[in-house]
Amino acid sequence: MVEAILRSTLGARTTVMAALSYLSVLCFVPLLVDRDDEFVYFHAKQGLVIWMWGVLALFALHVPVLGKWIFGFSSMGVLVFSLLGLVSVVFQRAWKLPVVSWVADRI
């Protein structure tokens, strides 16, 4: 599917829109604006899953004692996966991030 997209066919707009997918709440911009582009849509779905994970991590702060630990580890995971997603966009690849892509495929 996405692997069939060649590097030379991706323009600057596509790269910027795909990169926005991994910047927190800005993941909604590519989902709403550039839904027809398969490369952007792939990254937008993964970015949406990462954003939802971050929002759920905030709710973990309400759990006594363990909430701070859960939030800390989840925040690190969100940061790492967002950076990996941005790197894959810069290299113009469609890397399936572990667990994130599994959830994104079911959206």
Swiss-Prot record:
Cysteine pairings via disulfide bonds: none
Subcellular localization: Magnetosome membrane
Recorded topology in the membrane = Multi-pass membrane protein
Q: Does the keyword Transmembrane helix apply?
A: yes
Q: What induces it?
A: Part of the probable mms6 operon.
Residues assigned to the Lumenal compartment are: 35-46, 91-107
Q: What GO CC annotations are associated with the protein?
A: magnetosome membrane
Identify the residue ranges that face the Cytoplasmic compartment according to the record.
1-13, 68-69
Record keywords = Biomineralization, Magnetosome, Membrane, Transmembrane, Transmembrane helix
Reported consequences of knocking out the gene: Intermediate magnetic response, slightly smaller magnetosomes. Double mamF-mmsF and double mms6-mmsF deletions have a normal magnetic response, slightly smaller, fewer magnetosomes. Deletion of the 4 gene operon (mms6, mmsF, mms36 and mms48) gives an intermediate magnetic response with fewer, smaller magnetosomes in irregular pseudo-chains.
The source's domain of life comes to: Bacteria
Miscellaneous comment as given in the Swiss-Prot or TrEMBL entry: This bacteria makes up to 60 cubo-octahedral magnetosomes of about 45 nm in diameter which contain membrane-bound crystals of magnetite (Fe(3)O(4)).
Q: What is this protein's function?
A: Plays a role in regulating magnetite crystal size; partially redundant function with MamF.
Family indicated by similarity: Belongs to the magnetosome MamF/MmsF protein family.
Q: What is this protein called?
A: Magnetosome protein MmsF
Organism (species): Magnetospirillum gryphiswaldense (strain DSM 6361 / JCM 21280 / NBRC 15271 / MSR-1)
